[in-house]
Amino acid sequence: MATTTAGLTDLKFRVVREDFADAVAWVARSLPTRPTIPVLAGVLLTGTDEGLTISGFDYEVSAEVKVSAEIASAGSVLVSGRLLSDITKALPAKPVEVSVEGTRVSLTCGSARFSLPTLAVEDYPALPALPEETGVIASDLFAEAIGQVAVAAGRDDTLPMLTGIRVEISGESVVLAATDRFRLAVRELTWVTTAGDVEAAVLVPAKTLAEAAKAGTDGNQVHLALGSGASVGKDGLLGIRSEGKRSTTRLLDAEFPKFRQLLPAEHTAVATIGVAELTEAIKRVALVADRGAQIRMEFSDDTLKLSAGADDVGRAEEDLPVDFAGEPLTIAFNPTYLTDGLGSLHSERVTFGFTTPSRPAVLRPAGEDDGANGGSGPFPAAKTDYVYLLMPVRLPG
């Protein structure tokens, strides 16, 4: 819980600059750009015998981090989060000394000195308590999985169901999914449940979850708290706890689209190619395409031809070797969405699965048996823990 007692105003501490700057920056990232009340733009600094706690809260998202510091005098103070973040990032690599003097905060680092106004700490809301822990996952796996699906999440706040990541929990199995209507990313993984036989599905803001996932990589494990038993998700809150950090976010009250029916069970054609060479070629060819315009992909037995542009803006083509099976195929995609998908695979090679040029294509990490298959379809969709489904762009004519 955050301390909001008005009497604690004589805070004084000394802290390592890098630790302080990193902690303030992490908390400040969750602060609202346009706070509904002035105090929500602040970060709360609280010093106790246990060290320094830095926290922020805007009624939607909370963030709290503990930092090792020499506390000369316990107390708490509220200051502008973004200003403090900018200052601490610019300080020299020397110890930082902070003290409260009346209604101002004095900050000294080497020969640099700052005097900042304080905000009304007594008006600052208490941070919400974390729900009961639901499960634990390795921090690097958590960060990778969230990053792979967050790339497909929508950014239009008028469509809240598309700005979230759907988290489906079934015992030790977790499925993450996100879509913006043009692409869909789905990742399956396992974790250690600490709340018994859990069956639940919640929708978490993608931006907040992605930030929390990146922050959790400095520890060994990430603890997720949604409640236990029948209460999972009922608080409308997700809590995330990792090494010295904890955060909460309100769940989205929206219905995520039914996505499993979009994943084809078989393909009429498949193609396998190196991710790096394809990505670089797409970037080159797309230089003549207007922003958001299409890049065409023509697949034949052993060649992929990339092309883009028109006579009035310029044309570009590039041929790449490819392992292809099925009838020759021409399909077009938004180049940005395509490279986003390739980058999220975390694989040296990608396998495309096609049905028709007007239907979504599936991108997945290539398996050992992919490539140089030959033959004709249909080809059953391979089992994989990650898929990126991408809508094509209508071809001219």
From Swiss-Prot:
Top-rank lineage group of the source organism: Bacteria
GO CC annotation: cytoplasm; DNA polymerase III complex
SMART domains: POL3Bc
CDD domains: beta_clamp
Keyword terms: Antibiotic resistance, Cytoplasm, DNA replication, DNA-binding, DNA-directed DNA polymerase, Nucleotidyltransferase, Transferase
Entry's Gene Ontology molecular function annotations: 3'-5' exonuclease activity; DNA binding; DNA-directed DNA polymerase activity
Disulphide connectivity of cysteines: none
Signal sequence, start to end: none
Misc. comment: Strains that are resistant to griselimycin occur at a very low frequency (5 x 10(-10)) and are associated with amplification of a chromosomal segment containing this gene as well as the ori site (with a single point mutation in the promoter region), suggesting antibiotic resistance may be due to overexpression of the protein.
Family: Belongs to the beta sliding clamp family.
Protein name: Beta sliding clamp
Lineage: Bacteria, Bacillati, Actinomycetota, Actinomycetes, Mycobacteriales
Gene name of this polypeptide: dnaN
